[in-house]
């Protein structure tokens, strides 16, 4: 499975739950996709799997939202406002060193500054209708531990 068809917000959250449940800590997840593709919906599923009770909101205006009260910390980041790639306001090495899960939306703006060890999901709309929840999610695992992580995620969809 290098791609997965998603037909509803519930299925997107199910994928998020699979990601969260199979996370081992010190994980880096990159989420690519247009506005409204489902990146935050996916992250809500991750938070549920990590037993985070607070509502998950898009970090578009805050850049980073921290959720530390679950089974492991979740750091939800949105790099859309960092088009210049200036990470000086974010302690990225500190977040990556924690035993948590770092989720980065719009990673293309900072990809050169990230370790070459991550799982990337590219979320694409199947059609142009804003009402449609149909998506294709493509997976790319970089590094051996992320290939193992992806194989664990796939088990939830066999």
Where are the regions that the model predicts?
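N-terminal pre-Walker A segment at the start of P-loop NTPase domains
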Residues: 1-18
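Short phosphate-coordinating micro-motif centered on Lys-Gly-acidic
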Residues: 2, 93-158
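Phosphate-binding P-loop
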Residues: 19-26
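Short hydrophobic/aromatic beta-strand immediately N-terminal to the Walker A/P-loop
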Residues: 28-30
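P-loop (Walker A) phosphate-binding loop of NTP-binding proteins
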Residues: 32-34
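Conserved lysine of the Walker
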Residues: 39
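Post-Walker A helix-loop "phosphate-sensing" segment adjacent to the P-loop in P-loop NTPases
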Residues: 48-58, 69-72
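Conserved nucleotide-sensing/catalytic segment adjacent to the nucleotide-binding pocket
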Residues: 60, 66-108
């Amino acid at each position: 499975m290098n791609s997965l068809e998603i037909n509803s917000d519930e299925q997107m959250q199910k994928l998020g739950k699979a990601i969260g449940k199979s996370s081992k800590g010190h994980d880096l997840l990159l989420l690519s996709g247009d506005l409204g593709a489902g990146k935050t919906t996916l992250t809500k599923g991750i938070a549920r799997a990590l037993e985070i009770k607070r509502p998950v909101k898009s970090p578009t205006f805050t850049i980073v939202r921290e959720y530390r009260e679950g089974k492991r910390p979740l750091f939800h980041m949105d790099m859309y406002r960092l088009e210049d790639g200036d990470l000086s306001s974010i302690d990225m090495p500190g977040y990556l060193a924690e035993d948590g899960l770092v989720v980065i939306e719009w990673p293309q703006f900072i990809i050169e500054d990230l370790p070459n060890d991550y799982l990337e999901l590219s979320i694409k709309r199947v059609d142009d209708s804003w009402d449609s929840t149909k998506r294709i999610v493509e997976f790319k695992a970089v590094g051996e531990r992320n290939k193992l992580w992806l194989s664990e995620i796939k088990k939830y969809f066999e």
